[in-house]
Amino acid sequence: MKILLIMSFFLAIGCGQKEKIKLAEQKSVTVQKPVQLQNQPKRPDYAIKAPDFTLKTIQGELFKLSENKGKVILLNFWGTWCRPCRREIPDFNKLIKNYQKDGLVIVGITLKRSSYETDSSIADFMNDWDINYTILTDINNYESQVVTANYGQAIGQPITGIPTTLIIDREGYIVKGYVGPRSEEIFYKDLKPYLSSES
């Protein structure tokens, strides 16, 4: 009789725990499920929330990703020393000129190769290349490396090659990624569904 009572006690506890775990799993799925706005293009199933960050523009102003919700963001990890990155600059200039009015924001996160690369030398590079979109750098030291590591973790693979470029939709989800340079035409084809809809 005692054994039956003990077994039924553990069975009741076990069921209760299973129900709690099941309920917790349901809650976490509900919380993490992206909200799809009616006038947005269908977000891919693999889309993930872009990690928020704060970095500094070359002009010295703070840039916080989450303050750009409602915009379509082309996030580019690049370096002034990277030749393939340089190839994309004219295409990014054209894209921002043509589609900023539609809500496009292009943001370059600068990965410095050495301590000799300063905000001043990056500003000179921007002037030489007529860069007309936002370029970000560290606030103090190494924040851009932390952001790069966080994005590598978010997309499931470290960002070791640059340029690496991500499209972030108006609700802040990473919907497309590229490793290596791409043309204006390729970027526009993938950006177009997100630019033509507004939040």
Cite the ranges covered by each PLM segment:
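N-terminal targeting signals for export/organelle localization
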Residues: 1-52, 177, 199
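A short beta-strand-turn-helix
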Residues: 47, 52-73, 96-99
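Conserved redox-active cysteine motifs that mediate thiol-disulfide chemistry
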Residues: 69, 77-94
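Structural microenvironment flanking redox-active thiols in thiol-disulfide oxidoreductases
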Residues: 87-131, 141-152
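Thiol/disulfide oxidoreductase modules built on the thioredoxin-like
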Residues: 129-131, 138-192
